[in-house]
Amino acid sequence: MITEREIYLTNPEEKRKVIEFLETFQLTFTGNIDYTMGLYDDDELIGTGSLGGRVMRDIAIKLSYQGRGLTRRIIRNLQIESYRRGVT
């Protein structure tokens, strides 16, 4: 089952995992991030997205999971978190 959860970038191990995941897509972690979430299949990170102010950033889905509507889940999670933070 695929689950969503916040990734705490203050944890060096969690941050390293996000950076390495993004690098597999030739994406560079942008920094200046207020919130990051991950999609997990069991404990495997299969997707991620972040908020930096009003901007959604660093959105990626593992290739073998693409085409399943998971980007929509990431965007929706980021929208909800943005509204929760009062950023519209």
Question: What kind of region is each of these model predictions?
Answer:
Residues 82-88:
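Conserved GNAT acetyl-CoA-binding A-motif
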Residues 28-29, 48:
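Short secondary-structure boundary/capping segments
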